[in-house]
């Protein structure tokens, strides 16, 4: 049934937390092992950087974070594309829509703990698992 299952495009959803750093490590390692491309996506929640001057400062910080991830992927020999998107809807919907639009084969996302996955149905990771158009690997 899964003989032809090929993972060629991996999306790692980032928020700058320790959890997402572990997710990046997994995504890059998987990309290396599977010869897959990795896309690192950071979504800025609507209204996070208000007033306008904070948006610029926040975006500079976000790009610096993504640059560091790019360096990590280059060291591992993995093609990595980074992108920052300002959420027009929920972060969960943005991740699912991006994965669908880009024909992603696997989403990798971090989570704080197993108890969060079981009990916090409103969490981003749980929402992505429920709404994603492809398999999701949850990293704790």
Mark where each language-model region is.
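Structural beta-alpha unit
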Residues: 1, 5, 75-107
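Small/aliphatic-rich secondary-structure junction motif
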Residues: 3-54, 72-76, 81
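Short secondary-structure boundary segments
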Residues: 42-43, 110-112, 140
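Glycine-rich, Arg-bearing micro-motifs that act as flexible, cationic patches
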Residues: 106-131
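Alpha-helix N-cap and loop-to-helix initiation/capping positions
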Residues: 53-61
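Short, flexible loop segments at boundaries between secondary-structure elements
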Residues: 134-140
């Amino acid at each position: 049934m899964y003989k032809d299952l090929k993972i060629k495009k991996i999306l790692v959803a980032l928020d700058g937390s320790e959890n997402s750093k572990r997710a990046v490590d997994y995504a890059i390692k998987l990309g290396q092992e599977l010869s897959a491309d990795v896309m690192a996506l950071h979504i800025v929640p609507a209204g996070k950087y208000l007033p306008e001057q904070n948006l610029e400062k926040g975006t500079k910080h976000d790009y610096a974070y993504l640059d560091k991830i790019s360096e990590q992927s280059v060291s591992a020999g993995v093609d990595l594309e980074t992108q920052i998107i300002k959420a027009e809807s929920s972060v969960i919907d943005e991740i699912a829509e991006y994965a669908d639009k880009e024909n992603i084969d696997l989403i990798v996302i971090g989570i704080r703990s197993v108890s969060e996955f079981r009990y916090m149905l409103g969490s981003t990771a749980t929402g992505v698992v429920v709404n994603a158009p492809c398999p999701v690997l949850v990293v704790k």
